[in-house]
C-alpha cells in the first residue's frame, strides 16, 4: 500500500498564547484518534504551533483504508423461515439491512445450529475522501472555552481563519474547513520574509516556512531558542535570567521569530521590594528578570522581540520607556503605603465583603486571629505571635501596592510588617499564609506561619461548607480543594499534632450562629479525607490501600499518614494476602451473625486445639500491641500481627465456627471479632485485593 506525508495547517489570527500548546496537543491527539478509528496506517504525528497557525504533519500515511472482509450473522434458520419455507419478517429485515435478499444469503453451520450469513468484501475508502471530515471533527473537539464568529459567516473558531492547507504528498486535498477552501498557500511572518507563498509537498514543512516565511513553526524549537538565547544574554551581564516555565511557554506562544534583547531600568527602583518589580516585569510586560549569583535582582531585564530589526536599540529603548512608568508606580505605592502602619488598615477591612452570608474581611480577620492562636497552642508555636499574625493577615489587601499589583498580596504584608518593626516570624507568616499555592509548592517555614496558613484555609472551608456551598463538579470558586490539600500537606509534612475533628469544630465555633448546615463538621472532614484519597493516589499508593485506611476514618492527618505507610509495608510481607483473605472471611462471617456476642472470649468454652492456640496468640498480642497503637507504631504492629497467619489458617481448617451448640458458636464468633478488632486498630485489611 502506498504511503505519503500528510500536512494540515490552519492559518489564523493571533491565537490565545496561554492556550496555544494545549490547542496543538489536543489537535494532534484528536486527529491521531481519528486516524486509528478509521484504520488508516500512519507513522509519527507531529504538531506545530505558532501565534498564527496550528499544524499537523503525519509521516507514512496510507493512501486508503485496507480492504476488509465483513461477516454479519442473521437469524437462526429455525426463525428465518416459516413452516412453508417462506422468509420471516426478521430474515427479510436483516437481509434488507445487508443490501441483499434472503435467497442471496449464505448459511453458517456450527455444532450449535445453522444461521443465515452475509459475507462481503469491502474496499477501503481513500484517505483523500476521509481526511476532510477527520480534520473538521478534530478541530471541533478542541478545548476552546469561548468561540468567535467573524464576518458574515456562521463559522465559529477560537480566532478568525485565513488559510487552510491540506496536502497528501504533493496533492491538495479539496475541502472546505472552517469556511475556507483548502489550498497550498501558506502565510509567513507579518513583517519579515514572504508574506504569502505556496508549498509544493507536505515534506517541505516546516523548513519552507522557516526559510521563506521567517516563522519557526516548531513550538519546542522556538521555546528552546528563547531559553538558550536568554541564558546567554544574562551571562553577558553577569547574571541569571528568571526563566520560569510558565512565562517561557507564554512568550514562545507570542512570537514567530524570537529575537532576545537586553534592557535596563534605573537602579533607584531596586529600593522597591523585588517581588513588586518582578510582578510587573513578568506579569504585565512578559519580561525575564535577571538576578546576580547571590539571588539579588539586577537593574536589567531580558525580553523577546518578534522581529529582527536593523536598529535593535530602538526596540530596547521603547521597552525601557514602557516599563519605567510601571516601576515608578510601584515605587510611589511602596513609599505611600509605608506612611501608615499595617494595622491602620484594619477599619477598612470592614468595608470589603468576604462572602454575603459570612461577613466582611474584618470578620474573617477576627476569626483567623482566634483560630491561629488556638492552633499555635496545639502545635507549640508562639501564641502571641500567631494571634498578631492573624490580626494583620489581610491588612495588606487594603494597600495601594496590592490593589494595583494583586499577586503581591502576602509578600507586601511581609515587607510592610518588617518596616513596622513586627516580629520576624509574624512578618514571614503574612507572606506564607497562602502557601502551598499549588501542587509541589513550598510549605510555610515556621510554626507561626503554619498556624496562620491552616487557620486561613480552615476558616474558608468551615464557612463555605457551613452555608452549603460545596464544590460541585469542576466548579470550586473558593478553591476549597486546594485549601483542604494545603492543610493536610502542612499537618502531615510538618508532623503537627492536630486532629481534623477538633480543628474543624473550633473553626465552626468561631462563626457563631452564621452557619446553616448542621452537618458542617462531618462534611468538612469527609471532604478533607477525600482529598487524602487524591493525594495518596498521586503519590503512587493503590486505591485499596487508601480505602483500607479510610475505612477507619482517622482524623489526625499525621496518624493517617503513618497508617498508610504501615499498610503499604504490610502488603510486601509474605503473609499479607492470606491475612487479608482471612480478614475478609471473618468480616463476612461476622456480618451474617445475628446473635449478640460476648464481651470476652471464655477460655473454658474453647474445645479445639486450633481455637485454643489462636486465643492464646490474641491475648499475647493484645497486651503487647497496645503501646504500639498508642504511639502510632502501626508498621511494627502489623509485622507482629503477621505472625497470626499460621494460627488463623489452622483455625479455619480445623474449627467449625457455626457450631450447633450455642455457647461454643458465640464464643468462636467472639474470638473472630477479637481477631478483627486487632487489625482494625490499624486499618480494614479485608479491603486489600
UniProtKB/Swiss-Prot annotation:
It is found in: Cytoplasm. Belongs to the class-II aminoacyl-tRNA synthetase family. Tetramer of two alpha and two beta subunits. One of its GO terms (biological process) is arginyl-tRNA aminoacylation. Its main location: cytoplasm. GO terms for molecular function: arginine-tRNA ligase activity; ATP binding; glycine-tRNA ligase activity. PANTHER family: GLYCINE--TRNA LIGASE, CHLOROPLASTIC_MITOCHONDRIAL 2, GLYCYL-TRNA SYNTHETASE. InterPro entries: DALR_anticod-bd, Gly-tRNA-synth_bsu, Gly-tRNA-synth_heterodimer. This is Glycine--tRNA ligase beta subunit. It is an enzyme of class 6 (ligase). The gene is glyS. One of its GO terms (cellular component) is cytosol. It comes from the Bacteria. The keyword NADP does not apply. Its EC number is 6.1.1.14. The keyword Aminoacyl-tRNA synthetase applies. It catalyses: tRNA(Gly) + glycine + ATP = glycyl-tRNA(Gly) + AMP + diphosphate. Keywords: Aminoacyl-tRNA synthetase, ATP-binding, Cytoplasm, Ligase, Nucleotide-binding, Protein biosynthesis.
